[in-house]
Curated annotation (Swiss-Prot):
It is found in: Mitochondrion. Gene3D superfamilies: P-loop containing nucleotide triphosphate hydrolases. Its main location: mitochondrion. ATP binds at G259, L260, D261, A262, T263, G264, K265, T266. Keywords: ATP-binding, Coiled coil, Kinase, Mitochondrion, Nucleotide-binding, Pyrimidine biosynthesis, Transferase, Transit peptide. This is UMP-CMP kinase 2, mitochondrial. It comes from Mus musculus.
Length: 447
């Protein structure tokens, strides 16, 4: 079943590809719109390419990325037809499962990169998450293994396998393959051409209500889709449904304190609450924190819905406690949104949503704090503190330590939050100095 691989295809293959593409486009007519793709490179830059008709244009960067030596493959997870968030949840689960399968077994021989497919417009629902796989040794069984993996998908919207190949004239082609019985069948082809970088990251239209939720109902709808395969989702929903939809803050101050790893946030929140005789709350709250590990292992849309609903549970507690005492909140909506944006938007700092984008705006139905403080430390102090830490870390905390670009994206995203914005506090000095500074900020904001 395996086919013989060659570094470059013969001349007749390029001619055949052109004829196949012409027939396909004639049959599809105006329905066949070019698909665009973006790939994150090791230096955190993004490269874009589009599928279209053959031209004489050759792009050295694309040839190096997708052409020989070795062989490259791509797959994107499509959305199934349907209304609501069900298709997005299903696609996210397929993508998550494929990632786990690609990281084990014989397909570990392939190098993985993030791939995003998107349409020519900027409408939500066009983005398709996927993978670019690079087989440096061009193993003869890689295509077969990938087709069998995709063939095991039971979902209606099944991913297709694309393979990249250069012809004798140096043009790059993408060919779609299917496994029909025990035969590998090519079902489509198109020429791979460079594309201009869009003005905004192509994922931005899909960020809202897929990673950053604008209201309680949007997050709730996602977990509702999960109750059949995550029993704990029903328990979370039951707790949320016990909370009134509209809550109001009491007469006392509500202060949210945010901070990256090694900023001393946990210690500071305790000290501030003791100094002010305030109630200390955490997000997610203890009533659902027992299920964090379960949801941390789920795809982004499910994980973020869980943390978003945790904020609404905390809001109910804030409303109750702030009638009698000041309230200090250890993390709130800003951290939920910040990590979602920094994780989902591929590439470096320049690809983040621009300032004043809707993803930086506080949800209209979530109780708002009076003041949000963001603790920061300089790099030297951060390294010193991290060396003394041994507690278990979340995936995102581990990423913060290992990936400086991700850390910069998190910091920049925090600083772009609005309504309310974050007040930066340098937490590098001694604990006593930082505590005094924070208490002064709280006092001045309450005047």
């Amino acid at each position: 079943m395996a086919l013989i691989s060659r570094p470059r295809a013969p001349l007749w293959l390029g001619r055949l590809s052109r004829r196949l593409c012409g027939r396909h486009q004639a049959c599809m007519g105006t329905m066949a719109r070019p698909r665009r793709f973006t790939v994150e490179l090791p230096d955190c830059s993004l490269t874009h390419f589009v599928l279209g008709d053959a031209t004489d244009h050759r792009d050295a960067r694309l040839a190096e990325l997708l052409g020989p030596p070795g062989r490259s493959y791509a797959l994107c997870v499509p959305l199934a037809p349907g209304e609501g968030c069900g298709p997005r949840v299903q696609a996210a689960r397929v993508h998550h499962r494929l990632l786990q399968q690609l990281r084990r077994g014989p397909l570990q021989r392939c190098q993985l990169s993030k791939l995003l497919g998107y349409g020519p417009g900027d409408q939500a629902g066009e983005a398709q998450h996927g993978f670019l796989l690079r087989d440096p040794c061009d193993h003869p069984d890689t295509r077969r293994d990938l087709l069998q993996l995709l063939g095991s998908c039971q979902e209606a919207a099944r991913p297709q396998l694309a393979e990249f190949q250069a012809d004798s004239q140096g043009l790059l082609w993408q060919r779609l393959w299917e496994l029909q019985g025990d035969r590998q069948v090519q079902v489509d082809c198109a020429c791979v051409l460079p594309a201009q970088e869009p003005h905004l990251h192509p994922l931005l239209p899909d960020l809202l209500n897929s990673a950053v939720f604008q209201d309680r109902d949007a997050a709730r709808a996602v977990l509702e889709e999960c109750t059949s395969f995550i029993p704990e989702a029903r328990a979370v929903l039951d707790l949320v449904d016990q909370c009134p939809k509209e809550v109001q803050k009491g007469k006392f101050q509500v202060i949210a304190i945010e901070g990256l790893d090694a900023t001393g946030k946990t210690t500071l929140t305790q000290s501030v609450s003791e100094s002010l005789k305030a109630v200390l709350l955490q997000s997610p709250p203890p009533c659902i924190s027992q299920w964090r590990k379960i949801f941390d292992d789920e795809p982004t849309i499910i994980r973020r819905a869980f943390y978003s609903l945790g904020n609404y549970l905390v809001a109910s507690e804030i409303a109750k406690e702030s009638t009698n005492f000041p309230v200090i909140v250890d993390r709130y909506w800003h951290s939920t949104a910040t990590y979602a944006i920094a994780t989902e938007v591929s590439g470096g700092l320049q690809y983040l949503p621009p300032a004043h984008h809707p993803v930086y705006q506080w949800p209209g139905d979530l109780l708002k704090p009076d003041l949000v403080l963001l603790l920061t430390v300089n790099s030297e102090e951060r390294v010193r503190r991290l060396q003394g830490r041994g507690q278990e870390k979340t995936k995102e905390e581990a990423e913060l330590e290992a990936n400086n670009v991700f850390r910069q994206k998190v910091e920049m995203t925090y600083q772009r939050m609005e309504n309310p914005s974050c007040h930066l506090v340098d937490a590098s000095p001694s604990r006593e100095t930082v505590l005094q500074k924070v208490l002064e900020l709280i006092q001045s904001s309450g005047r």
